[in-house]
């Protein structure tokens, strides 16, 4: 045997015997046996039997595929209120995954508490929402008082990004129980009573939904009494656009995916993380079967083989509602259903981006993909994927049964359709307001919110959540819809409207959302990762370095991979365009206002 063909484990640096081949040392038989024994062992930290048994007890007979990694991490995190290293090592062994893969996923998501084996998991965690709406309602003062009031070493109080309950601001979440209009006393009472789970919500159940005509459209499609092409045409004619923020025409998306090769998949996005947005949660808590029917109609028309529903982890109560509704549907439906899997997010805002959500469903870090290819062609598990926001599917049944003209017949100021506005901030009656597309902010507040809160005058507003920009009261008569706000440096997105008054400053709102973006950047691309953090630092100065901030805004907008980094500069640009008096060092300069106390001129 020539030296060049000799197995590497036979070539040693020293040995008791030598061959006749100059420069080559051959191992002894005992050394070869020891080398073979070592090569059969795993390298790195090994799982201990006790931890393996604890992990097995939690995941049971559930699949060990990579795409359920996050589900298994949730089970461990819930049971032990944290992820100790020993459990992560054991899970890696059980799932036959590299430990690095398990650790990098566990450390990516905010809701996973990765602990050293010597660390003690917190007995109870209270999360105080520091989103803009809660900040306006006194979240900072709540955060300051709670640690002293609670006085428990085993109770941890931390700040958390928007929890999707802005109409109830301020909000604190005691383990999984959201405390609305939270005061220190209400939170302390929930802690002392160990009231840590969400209260059950009353919703339209399967029988009540069927009694008023629910699931009839799905049954007619399966029976051939309704035609898929007619349904698709109705969707196209209605003008319904994606209501998660992107605004892509829903019917066109159905047709694109329908033309792709099989198998085709569907991913439903209920990771409602845009600060100020709570419409999906509100509808899901009240009428889950209307959404499920729209989902099944889309699946039938497009030819979907499996559906994955990605639900925001903050929505613990919704998870119970949706689990029950799916169980009712699967046991009562008289027609075949595609496979439906409910997946749980883990506190990463970036997973609201469609490709990041797909990465998360596949059990990976939620990092956006480069495009093309688009997920309609290469999506979940490499298959053509129909991705939809919850509310988009919620309206499918009404549009098809009432006709495309029913939906498109609504609208104001030349716009068509309906929009669900999540309104919070300085108004008397915050909440989800179903209103005609194209309604102005002034009309929305006067007609649907009972006017401005007492003692408050309209000063500014965010028309599209954290990323949609900030507009002054002088632009309160601009129609609110897709494509109407871009000329003013803003967009409507998910229609999360946060109203500011003369008691607030736009620069403070911009800083709040920029800090949010800095915390939520996935870190994949430098312009977003570094730019958001640097911008948040610069925005704290009494006088802004406008040139540097505009340079940062340009780089982030041009070079970021996904919408987070591209839209993060919007609040900066808006403050510099409409509220320069707040950041240029002029003392006590009031902006020009065109409204007296209240909203109506």
Q: Where is each model-derived feature located?
A:
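Ferredoxin-type iron-sulfur electron-transfer modules in oxidoreductases and energy-metabolism complexes
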Residues: 9, 21, 35-126, 130-163, ...
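Histidine-anchored nucleotide/phosphate-binding helix
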Residues: 109, 287-301
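Gly-rich Lys/Arg/Thr-decorated short loops/hinges at beta-loop-alpha junctions or inter-strand turns
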Residues: 210-216, 268-280, 375-380, 422-427
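N-terminal glycine-rich phosphate/pyrophosphate-binding loops that anchor nucleotide-derived ligands
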Residues: 230-264
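Short amphipathic, charge-patterned alpha-helical segments
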Residues: 294-296, 437-453
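Hydrophobic alpha-helical positions that pack around
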Residues: 319-437, 449
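Short loop-to-beta-strand transition segments
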Residues: 450-465
């Amino acid at each position: 045997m020539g030296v060049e063909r000799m197995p590497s484990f036979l070539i040693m640096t020293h040995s008791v015997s030598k061959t006749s081949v100059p420069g080559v040392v051959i191992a002894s038989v005992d050394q070869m046996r020891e080398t073979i024994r070592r090569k059969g062992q795993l390298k790195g930290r090994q799982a201990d039997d006790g931890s393996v048994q604890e992990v097995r007890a939690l995941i049971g007979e559930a699949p060990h595929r990579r795409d359920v990694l996050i589900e298994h991490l949730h089970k461990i995190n819930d049971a032990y209120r944290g992820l100790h290293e020993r459990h992560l090592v054991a899970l890696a062994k059980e799932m036959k995954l590299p430990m690095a893969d398990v650790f990098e996923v566990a450390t990516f998501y905010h809701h996973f508490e990765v602990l050293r084996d010597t660390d003690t998991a917190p007995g109870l965690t209270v999360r105080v929402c520091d989103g803009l709406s809660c900040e306006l309602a006194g979240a900072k003062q709540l955060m300051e008082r709670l640690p002293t009031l609670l006085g428990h070493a085993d109770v941890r109080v931390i700040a958390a990004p928007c929890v999707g309950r802005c109409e109830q601001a301020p909000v604190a979440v005691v383990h999984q129980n959201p405390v609305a209009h939270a005061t220190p006393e209400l939170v302390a009472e929930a802690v002392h009573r160990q009231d840590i789970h969400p209260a059950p919500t009353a919703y339209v159940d399967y029988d009540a939904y069927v009694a008023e005509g629910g699931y009839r459209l799905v049954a007619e499609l399966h029976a051939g009494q309704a035609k898929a092409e007619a349904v698709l045409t109705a969707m196209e004619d209605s003008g319904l656009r994606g209501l998660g923020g992107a605004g892509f025409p829903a019917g066109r998306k159905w047709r694109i995916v329908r033309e792709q090769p099989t198998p085709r998949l569907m991913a439903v996005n209920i990771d409602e993380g845009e600060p100020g947005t709570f419409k999906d949660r509100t509808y899901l808590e009240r009428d889950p079967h209307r959404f499920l029917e729209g989902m099944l109609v889309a699946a039938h028309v497009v030819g979907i083989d499996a559906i994955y529903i990605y639900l925001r982890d903050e929505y613990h109560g919704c998870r119970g509602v949706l689990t029950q509704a799916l169980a009712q549907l699967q046991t009562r439906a008289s027609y075949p259903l595609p496979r439906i899997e409910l997946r749980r997010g883990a506190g990463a805002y970036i997973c609201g981006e469609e490709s990041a959500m797909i990465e998360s469903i596949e059990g990976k870090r939620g990092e956006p993909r480069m495009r093309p290819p688009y997920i309609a062609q290469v999506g979940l598990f490499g298959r053509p994927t129909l991705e939809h926001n919850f509310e988009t599917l919620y309206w499918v049944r009404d549009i098809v049964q009432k006709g495309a003209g029913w939906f498109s017949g609504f609208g104001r100021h030349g716009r068509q359709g309906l929009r669900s506005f999540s309104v919070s901030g300085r108004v008397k009656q915050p909440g989800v307001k179903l209103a005609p597309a194209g309604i102005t902010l002034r009309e929305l507040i006067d007609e649907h919110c009972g006017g401005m809160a007492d003692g408050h005058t309209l000063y500014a507003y965010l028309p599209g959540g954290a990323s949609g920009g900030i507009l002054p009261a002088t632009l309160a008569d601009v129609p609110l819809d897709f494509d109407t706000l871009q000329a003013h440096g803003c967009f409507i997105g998910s229609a999360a409207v946060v109203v500011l008054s003369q008691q607030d400053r736009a620069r403070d709102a911009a800083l709040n959302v920029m800090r949010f973006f800095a915390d939520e950047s996935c870190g994949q691309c430098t312009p977003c990762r570094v730019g958001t953090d640097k911008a948040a630092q610069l925005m704290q100065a009494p006088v802004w370095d406008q040139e540097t901030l505009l340079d940062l805004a340009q780089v982030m907008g041009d070079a970021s991979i996904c919408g987070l980094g591209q839209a993060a500069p919007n609040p900066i640009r808006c403050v510099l365009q409409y509220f320069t008096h707040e950041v240029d060092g002029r003392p006590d300069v009031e902006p020009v206002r065109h409204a007296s106390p209240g909203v109506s001129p």
